[in-house]
Amino acid sequence: MVEFLKREYPSGTRVRLIRMDDSQAPPLGTEGTVTGVDDMGSLLVVWDNGSHLNVIHGVDEVQKLNKDTK
């Protein structure tokens, strides 16, 4: 799973937060940039609001953005 996530979300991938199970989570809809994937399969994200909370695979949800995503 980790290798799949590394291929699907390479460093620099832009994402939008859909769901995060954390009381300190950025607001839903916040966008950020993936900086890597850790050994547990969590996406390491620098959120545009300055937060650095990871996205936990299977718990949290992000939308992968591309140039056509609004």
List the predicted regions and their residue ranges.
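Basic/aromatic-rich interaction segments and small domains that mediate binding to polyanionic partners
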Residues: 2-70
